[in-house]
Amino acid sequence: MANAGFQEKSEKVIETFDELFKDYDYIVAPSASCAAYVKVYYPKILEGKHECISSKKIMDVVEFLHDVLKVDHVPGKFPHVVSVHNSCHGVRELGLSSPSERHIKPFNKIIDLLNMVEGITIHEPERKDECCGFGGMFSIEEPAVSTRMGEDKIKRHMATGAEYVTGPDSSCLMHMAGIAKKENMPIKFIHVVQILAAGL
């Protein structure tokens, strides 16, 4: 609701979320865009009305595994070729990887974790941090543009030779998977945690 511009109408939902989760040490989300919205926008929406404690505690699952737990071993095997999807929110609001428009030392926390998986081959597509076209309400308000962006992104993932597209943003994966299914594009989609958990 807030993402669609109805910020005042979403205040009660945000306050309820905060009350439910504020006492936990960490709030871990399986979607980078959802985690980013809580972290970046919840405090702005509630500014001067309610202290949003949960926004300081939420993180994407990749952040949690990489930065908090500091995972250095994964027991699983995944003998497949994957192309990593770096979502807009993950890159630019959560810092999961280095954005191409900034001249900083390259890093990618998603790839750091995937490199621990036995048998995996990892690629990134050309224009690796360009949007897939989902963008929440954007995909509803501009479906033709959203679909075309998704098609272009999928084709670039496929050009890597990947069997799977993986990443930490459920909404991006869902968007691209829907387009690929509708258009019979021969590539699969899997959340990064499903790969990391393959040996559990």
Model-derived regions: residue spans:
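Iron-sulfur cluster-binding electron-transfer modules in prokaryotic oxidoreductases
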Residues: 1-200
